[in-house]
From Swiss-Prot:
InterPro entries: DNA_Rcmb_RecR, Rcmb_RecR, Rcmb_RecR_Znf, TOPRIM_dom, TOPRIM_RecR. May play a role in DNA repair. It seems to be involved in an RecBC-independent recombinational process of DNA repair. It may act with RecF and RecO. A zinc finger (C4-type) spans 57-72. This is Recombination protein RecR. The gene is recR. Residues 80-175 form the Toprim domain. Belongs to the RecR family. GO terms for biological process: DNA recombination; DNA repair. The keyword Zinc-finger applies. The keyword Zinc applies.
């Protein structure tokens, strides 16, 4: 159907979001148009504020509005363990289960030889630098159970083991090909409790 240009542009904008197809984008566009001016202004203000005010923690790479992030500043956390994840959504998933109390490191991607993504293309150098000046004794690799997640975990293991750092992987309660952010709390708790050494 042919929509007026402002609606068509709004539909196009919504459809660029992950997991949003044309039908959902159309519903969101029409819902937004039906909102009060105050609600639309608040939505736009919050969207712009999130984009402007958030950045990546200089220590762990997590999305934050302060630097270093609240997790890195929290001295009550276990300073001897770092859990490595693909992105900030995985940090949120792990924090929601309230079972892990160590630190994090966010890679912002995975090694993917098929897509031309190597170790230098993700946030690994800062991890190695961070580990040199720390009391970390264990690194838990919590990448997704995919080919790229496995390639990344094996690379991390090969790099860190010679330095005497214990490298473990989440237990396989997680289905192969699944994303950590979508796993239920019980599965994540068991995956941490039953992690295996690489």
């Amino acid at each position: 159907m042919l929509y007026p240009t402002p609606i068509a542009k709004l539909i196009d904008s919504f459809s660029k979001l992950p997991g949003i197809g044309i039908k959902t984008a159309t519903r969101l566009a029409f819902y937004t148009i039906g909102m009060s001016d105050d609600d639309v202004n608040e939505f736009a203000k919050n969207l712009l504020a999130a984009k402007r005010e958030l950045s990546y923690c200089s220590v762990c790479g997590n999305l934050t509005d302060e630097d270093p992030c609240a997790i890195c500043q929290d001295q009550s956390r276990d300073q001897s363990t770092i859990l490595i994840v693909e992105d900030s959504r995985d940090v949120s998933a792990m924090e929601n289960i309230q079972e892990y109390h160590g630190l994090y490191h966010v890679l912002h991607g995975l090694i993917s030889p098929m897509n031309g993504v190597g170790p230098d293309d993700i946030n690994l150098k800062s991890l190695i630098t961070r580990l040199m000046d720390s009391e970390v004794t264990e690194v838990i690799v919590a990448t997704n159970a995919t080919a790229d997640g496995e390639a990344t975990s094996m690379y991390i293991s090969r790099v860190l083991k010679p330095a005497g750092i214990k490298v473990t992987r989440l237990a396989r309660g997680l289905a192969v090909g699944s994303d950590i952010e979508y796993a239920d709390e019980v599965t994540l708790i068991r995956a941490i409790e039953n992690r295996t050494e690489l």
